[in-house]
């Protein structure tokens, strides 16, 4: 929520006033992070030069030749500063978040704790594999939809200012006139991490989910069934489509502070599992 609500140049409202997110508070030197991920599953590794030597925690396959690096200058989200402004136009309000795209990845520090069950019909047809991942580490990366500059946001690494397009044009002109001066502005992506219990669902061909729309429909139905069976609010459970668009998988995780424990029950308690499947 913080990544999108308090994203670069975003407009927020408080006590009837309009505020623009203008700066990120820096506590030290800005340090970039390297992320490698498996596009088939969404499993991610941070700051590991030899990520290709790892195996995927879902498929067990080697990441050699499979993993991809997330391009750009990735920095961790810190506290933001917003300035009140009365000159924000309706067009600016509508445009600000349209340029955001939030991507979700995951990993686990204890793969031995991952357990699996199978989603089956009453007659035993195998529909999907479900893995329960306790203390799953979720990584959210905020990018710009603008394909230029590695989908990053213009950021002054010395002051923490988010640089508007107008200021960037002036800055580039000055850089051309004085190339000897150091350039503190970089195009960055923001990330944040959290830990939550999660389940990872791999649909099989027998489910006949032929496109991403069908996958999202299945994801919504399964998530809604969990909410209904365990009587929890929709905001307490998050869900994302993960991995390859041709063979997408599903990640469902607990959003509430502290563990709800419902996803663990789903995998470990047959009665809870059957109730959710029947409801879905």
Please annotate each region the language model reported:
Residues 1-16, 22-25, 52-280:
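Extended, highly charged accessory segments
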Residues 24-30, 35-37:
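Long, charged amphipathic helices and adjacent flexible linkers at domain junctions
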Residues 46:
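Zinc-coordinating Cys/His ligand positions in small cysteine/histidine-rich zinc-finger domains
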Residues 39-42, 80:
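Short solvent-exposed strand/turn elements
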Residues 3-6, 32-35, 42, 50-53:
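Residues immediately within or flanking Cys/His clusters that coordinate Zn2+
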């Amino acid at each position: 929520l913080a990544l999108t609500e308090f994203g670069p140049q975003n407009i927020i409202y408080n006590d009837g006033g309009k505020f623009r997110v203008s700066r990120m508070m820096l506590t030290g030197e800005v340090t970039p992070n390297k992320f490698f991920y498996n596009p088939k599953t969404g499993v991610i590794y941070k700051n590991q030069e030899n990520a290709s030597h790892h195996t995927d925690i879902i498929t067990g396959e080697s990441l050699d030749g499979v993993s991809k690096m997330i391009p750009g200058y990735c920095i961790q989200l810190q506290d933001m500063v917003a300035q009140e402004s009365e000159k924000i136009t309706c067009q600016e309000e509508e445009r600000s978040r349209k340029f955001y795209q939030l991507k979700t990845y995951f990993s686990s520090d204890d793969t031995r704790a991952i357990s699996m069950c199978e989603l089956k019909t009453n007659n035993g047809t195998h529909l999907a594999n479900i893995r329960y991942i306790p203390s799953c580490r979720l990584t959210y990366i905020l990018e710009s939809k603008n394909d230029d500059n590695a989908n990053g946001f213009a950021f002054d690494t010395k002051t923490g200012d988010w640089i508007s397009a107008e200021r960037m044009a002036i800055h580039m002109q000055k850089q051309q006139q004085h190339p000897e001066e150091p350039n503190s502005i970089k195009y960055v992506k923001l990330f944040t991490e959290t830990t939550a219990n999660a389940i990872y669902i791999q649909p099989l061909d027998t489910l006949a989910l032929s496109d991403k729309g069908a996958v999202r429909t299945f994801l919504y139905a399964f998530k809604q069934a969990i909410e209904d069976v365990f009587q929890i609010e929709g905001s307490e459970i998050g869900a994302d489509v993960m991995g390859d668009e041709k063979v997408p998988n599903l990640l469902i995780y607990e959003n509430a502070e502290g563990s709800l424990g419902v996803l663990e029950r789903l995998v470990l308690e047959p009665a809870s599992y059957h109730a959710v499947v029947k409801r879905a």
